[in-house]
Amino acid sequence: MSQLYTRPEFRRIAGEHWRPGGTEITDRLLALGRRWHDAGPEGRILDVGCGPGGSVRHLRQQGRQVWGLDTVLRPQWRAGTPAEAGVLPYLVADACAGLPLRDSVLDMILCECVLSVLPDTAAFLREARRVLRPGGLLACSDLYRRGEEGILVPQPAGCAAGARSRADWTALCEEAGFAVRHFEDASPALARLAAALVWYGARQSLREWGLCGPGCGGAEARPGYALWIAQKEE
């Protein structure tokens, strides 16, 4: 089963933000981050799993120093994102195999609906810690399991397969050397996007997400959406 963001009908409905909440969630993450590590507009941000670059363009329009990273070159990167010295602010790399950056160079890493689809989340979190400056932040939004503890098992290839409970997301971050400073439920954003998919006739996309009810584990899992801030500990 393919990941949800690869489906044309999902991209058509979600636009340039392949996740719940769009820029509202992005802005919320940055606002929360300022409580623990305010590097100002000059702070360096990397958007891992940036997709078509919607968050990169949004934050650069605010004057932020932000770059995007994804596993493939996206044609949308050239649209609406001014190049600096002829170079677009994007990198192509496998985030789990190694980020193409020196140690301690970033103030924040954005992971918006990314951790749950990574093949090796622990390896990525170790890399994230390496490239963040002391006190730097990992700002995440992702699917999480609001019901029983543990990873969703009925949907082994959909986006919801990697969703974890709050306790499990926290434990993963702590094992990699982060302290989770804030965690909040943002499930209404997930509900709005799910409703849009149904309204526009993309019900199959709900199955990709693991939100199709008891047949794929949706009812038992109570999948929700959350955002959290984790800080690099020394």
Language model segments and positions:
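Class I SAM-dependent methyltransferase SAM/SAH-binding core
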Residues: 52-97
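A short glycine-rich, Lys/Arg-flanked "PGG" loop and its adjoining helix->strand segment in the class I
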Residues: 122-137
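Conserved Class I S-adenosyl-L-methionine
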Residues: 184-234
